[in-house]
C-alpha cells in the first residue's frame, strides 16, 4: 500500500537524521521546500526579496517536468478575474474591456518565474500576485483567449529550496 511505503520511508529518514541540523557559516539554515518546480528551483532573493543566501540558489530540477502537476491550464471568467484583482490591488483599476493591454509581465527571474507584473496602474510582485489569485505557481503566462483569461502555470509552490517531487530522484 502506498501510504505504508511512504510512511516507512519517512520514518527511516527521520530516524537517520535524528539530532542533525543543516548549517551554513555555523548558523542553522532556513530550509524551504515546495511541491514541484518549473524545471529549475529559484534563488531565494528572487522569490522572497531576501538578500542572497548562498545555499538557496537556482538549480536545474528537470525531473519535475515529468510530474502530473507540472503544467496546469485554467480559463477564468474575465469579469471575475478583474473583480478579484481589483479587490486584492485596488490601485490597479482593471476593466474587463481590453484586458490583454492592461496586463504585462515585466520581469522574470532566471528560473522563468514572474518577478513583476503590471496590472493596470499597479505593479506587483509575482509571488504576491500568485498568492492573491491563488495560482499554483508564479511561473505563469496569462492571456485572453476566446473571451476567457487563460493562465498556464508551471510547477506548484514558490520554487525555492527543495522540490518534493525532485527529491524522489535523489
Where are the regions a protein language model picked out?
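Conserved, single-site charged/polar hotspot
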Residues: 1-170
Amino acid at each position: 500500500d502506498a501510504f505504508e511505503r511512504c510512511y516507512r520511508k519517512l520514518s527511516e529518514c527521520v530516524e537517520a537524521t535524528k539530532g542533525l541540523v543543516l548549517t551554513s557559516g555555523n548558523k542553522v539554515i532556513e530550509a524551504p521546500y515546495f511541491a514541484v518546480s518549473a524545471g529549475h528551483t529559484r534563488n531565494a532573493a528572487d522569490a522572497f526579496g531576501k538578500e542572497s543566501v548562498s545555499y538557496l540558489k537556482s538549480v536545474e530540477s528537470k525531473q519535475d517536468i515529468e510530474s502530473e502537476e507540472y503544467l496546469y491550464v485554467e480559463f477564468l471568467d474575465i469579469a471575475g478575474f478583474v473583480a478579484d484583482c481589483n479587490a486584492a490591488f485596488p490601485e490597479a483599476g482593471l476593466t474587463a474591456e481590453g484586458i490583454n493591454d492592461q496586463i504585462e509581465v515585466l520581469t522574470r527571474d532566471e528560473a522563468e518565474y514572474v518577478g513583476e507584473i503590471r496590472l493596470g496602474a499597479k505593479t506587483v510582485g509575482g509571488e504576491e500576485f500568485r498568492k492573491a489569485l491563488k495560482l499554483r505557481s508564479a511561473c505563469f503566462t496569462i492571456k485572453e483567449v476566446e473571451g476567457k483569461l487563460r493562465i498556464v502555470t508551471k510547477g506548484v509552490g514558490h520554487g525555492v529550496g527543495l522540490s518534493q517531487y525532485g527529491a524522489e530522484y535523489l
